[in-house]
Design a protein with these regions (language model features):
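Alpha-helical transmembrane segments and their short interhelical loops
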Residues: 127-200, 204-206, 266-286
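Transmembrane helix segments
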Residues: 66-72, 160, 186-237
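Short amphipathic alpha-helical coupling elements at transmembrane boundaries
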Residues: 36-44, 115-122, 190, 200, ...
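Junction motif at the cytosolic side of a transmembrane helix
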Residues: 2-15, 243, 260-293
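Hydrophobic alpha-helical transmembrane segments of multi-pass membrane transport proteins
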Residues: 59-68, 83-156, 202, 207
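Short hydrophobic, aromatic-rich alpha-helical segments embedded in or entering the lipid bilayer
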Residues: 3, 32-36, 214-259, 268
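Aromatic- and glycine-rich beta-strand/loop motifs that create alpha-glucan
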Residues: 11-58
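Short helix-coil transition/hinge motifs at the ends and kinks of transmembrane helices
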Residues: 22-24, 73-82, 246-265
Length: 293
């Protein structure tokens, strides 16, 4: 009996060590899958130079043409800080991040059509890291599109200060949220045409109902409710309150952000809303991905 107990005691540590080694092996495989899929999205982003150029040109056209036109239509304040282009600049940053980040989900749809996704699914890797790597790659690509636009902030009177580094970090979080939404749509949509239609229907309403083009406060009735419920409203307002210079909020009281009664959310609270959106979208996408494929 004593001999048997001694044998069990000596067998337990090797079994525990084997379990720990197995967990480390699974973690290493998951991290490797995340890194490979992240690199894949980044390489795809770097090779498509025409798309990079067009994604930068379109937001700048909105800023210089649409923004300048509305700047002439908005009544000027008494000071010299009233510039609608500076107010519109956070929306332009959001526009630069939005399209490429949400389009990252298209890679999942095309991989499903080409059969590459099936090869990923039979690999000895859990499925959540597959979506996480794609989301991180899409967020990196979206940040790469927004960086040239951010460098042109001086064109609308926004000074180059260290606060722009905080804006860059906020854009990274916003890009990850957009990519998570795009991945969620891609997991639910089985065909490329369906994905493109859904993304096209979602992008513009999300942008225009986020306070990017007009102030989020003081809106009438149902419109104010819809804008307040849009998570991207808080992303735009966080960018607007972080960007340096008075010109960003130079429309006076009309440039106030979203409010819930007498409470105005702080910038960390607004970024928390964006983080919750990203986490929910990625969680639902992972659940659907595990059940549908």
């Amino acid at each position: 009996m004593a001999e048997t107990a001694g044998t069990a005691d000596t067998a337990a540590p090797p079994r525990a060590a084997a379990d720990a080694a197995g967990r480390r092996g699974h973690l290493a495989a998951d991290l490797r899958a995340v890194r490979v899929l992240w690199q894949r999205e980044v390489i795809r982003f770097g090779r498509n130079r025409l798309r990079i150029a067009m994604s930068v040109i379109m937001p700048m056209m909105f800023l210089l043409v649409f923004g300048t036109g509305l700047n002439a239509a908005v009544p000027a304040e008494q000071d010299a800080t009233s510039d609608f282009r500076a107010f519109f600049f956070p929306g332009v940053l959001l526009m630069a991040v939005q399209a490429p980040a949400m389009a990252a989900g298209a890679s999942i749809v095309w991989d499903r059509q080409a059969g590459f996704l099936r090869q990923l699914l039979v690999a000895p890797v859990r499925r959540p890291p597959l979506l996480t790597g794609t989301c991180l790659g899409g967020a990196t690509a979206g940040l790469g599109y927004a960086l040239p636009v951010l460098c042109l902030a001086g064109l609308v009177g926004i000074p180059y200060r260290p606060e722009l580094l905080l804006v860059l970090a906020e854009l990274a979080l916003i890009a990850f949220a957009f990519t998570s939404l795009g991945v969620l749509v891609a997991v639910c949509a089985k065909h490329p045409e369906t994905f493109q239609i859904v993304i096209g229907l979602c992008m513009m309403p999300l942008l225009f109902l986020s306070g990017a083009v007009f102030p989020a406060s003081g809106l009438p009735g149902w419109l104010g409710t819809v804008v307040s419920l849009n998570p991207l409203t808080y992303a735009v307002d966080a960018l607007r309150r972080t960007l340096p210079g008075e010109g960003v909020s130079g429309l006076g009281d009309r440039a106030a952000g979203p409010q819930w009664g007498d409470w105005t959310p702080s910038v960390p609270a607004e970024l928390g809303c964006v983080a919750v959106l990203a986490a929910l979208a990625l969680t639902v996408a992972t659940y659907r991905f595990a059940r549908s494929e």
